[in-house]
Amino acid sequence: MTKKLTTVVEDIYDRIGVLGQGETIDVCDKDLDKFAEFMKQALKDWLTPRTNREPTLRMSNIGKPKRQLWYDMNSKRESQGIPSPVLIKFLYGHILERVVLFLTELAGHKVTDEQKEVKISGILGHMDCKIDGEVVDIKSASGFAFKKFRDGSLPDDDPFGYMAQLAGYEHSEETTDGGFLAINKETGELALFQPDELDKPNIPFKIEELQKIIK
């Protein structure tokens, strides 16, 4: 039976629930090796700092407030670097997101198009993946931020522009029923949030508007 994105959280809970009853889950070596290789690459990437690059519009930032974007693009101040605790947070957040995808596949859902490059009107981005044919952004979140995904209030409080990012990837892929699969870093709880189409911004218009403002 073909799985649907709408049941992914329930299916993950059902699949791993047997562990709590003393039953073993068999996973083939190929899948274990794939997971281990990702962890290895994640550590390599984390241990190699990115060189300073010129600020530019990207799919990951087009949803931020216009004033903030203009300042980010035009500010001449020197970078202060990233604090060590934040670097650690980036690492385990990245690892947790991979754990979520491992569990998704373990539960029988199809994961494709991981880190696929997307380009709209010259704006580049890399989507996290598709699950069962729908664009999905994987998020690791604090308990407070997780509530936005669990109760669906993200469109009303989206300071990082996640909605625009999702809408951009969906526009490129010509899909409409994607969403966010989030994990609570504090409790391990999962939540799937699929926004209504009316809550998503018009991406071609938004990009055109931003490109006029930010030279």
Regions picked out by a protein language model, each given a short descriptive name:
Residues 27, 156, 168, 172-215:
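Metal-dependent nuclease catalytic regions and adjoining charged, substrate-binding loops involved
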Residues 138-139, 181:
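Beta-strand residues in well-ordered beta-sheet regions across diverse protein folds
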Residues 157-165:
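Active-site glycine-rich loop that binds ribose-phosphate moieties when present
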Residues 1-135, 141-153, 160:
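Metal-dependent nuclease catalytic cores that hydrolyze phosphodiester bonds in DNA/RNA
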Residues 99, 164-168:
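Short Gly/charged-rich anion-binding patches and loops
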